[in-house]
């Protein structure tokens, strides 16, 4: 039977590869963050080092991903807009995200749970649970060769994290060229067979 599996961070996590997070079942995922008023500050391939995925009966529907958000990894892209951050900046970025955002969640700090709840011809509904709030996010997907690739947009403020986001945005204002965008792009891919 074909293994049709996808999940995300998404959001999205495991050991490092050129694509970002990779789970033992070959699920790959990452997310893109934007800063600056014109979204010119772009940090791609962000992921997490620790996550657990599960694909019941090797199928995409009801596949889950449980993410330890304190394991954030922003090392794949050192872009700072006009140049590159030094490698030491990764620790600063990871700590800023962990300490000034994820640790400030009122419920389930350090945890994001993801589940594929519906699949259609070229789209799927992906359920995210963060800060005790559950939301279903639409994702588009396509098959390229033997790989299923999916993309979606997640607004972190939909999860009741306004205070945490305000803290994070204030701490990172100069790093993010004046603005931190609360909508992130989530990408994931998995073998289609």
Where are these regions (language model features)?
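Low-complexity, acidic/polar, glycine-enriched regions of mature
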Residues: 20-193
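C-terminal segment of classical bacterial N-terminal signal peptides
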Residues: 14-20
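Sec-dependent N-terminal signal peptides
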Residues: 4-14
């Amino acid at each position: 039977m074909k293994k049709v599996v996808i999940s995300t961070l998404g959001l999205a996590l495991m050991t490092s590869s050129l694509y970002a997070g990779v789970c033992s079942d070959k699920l790959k995922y990452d997310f893109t963050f934007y800063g600056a008023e014109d979204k010119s500050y772009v940090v791609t391939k962000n992921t997490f080092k620790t996550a657990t995925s599960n694909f019941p009966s090797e199928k995409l529907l009801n596949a889950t991903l449980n993410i330890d958000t304190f394991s954030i990894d922003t090392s794949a892209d050192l872009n700072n807009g006009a140049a590159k951050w030094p490698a030491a900046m990764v620790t600063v970025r990871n700590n800023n995200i962990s300490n000034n955002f994820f640790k400030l969640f009122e419920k389930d700090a350090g945890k994001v749970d993801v589940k594929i709840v519906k699949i259609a011809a070229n789209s799927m509904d992906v359920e995210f649970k963060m800060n005790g709030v559950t939301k279903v996010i639409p994702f588009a997907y396509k098959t390229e060769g033997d790989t299923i690739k999916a993309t979606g947009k997640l607004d972190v403020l939909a999860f009741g994290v306004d205070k945490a986001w305000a803290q994070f945005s204030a701490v990172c204002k100069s790093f993010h060229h004046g603005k931190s965008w609360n909508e992130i792009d989530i990408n994931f891919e998995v073998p289609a067979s």
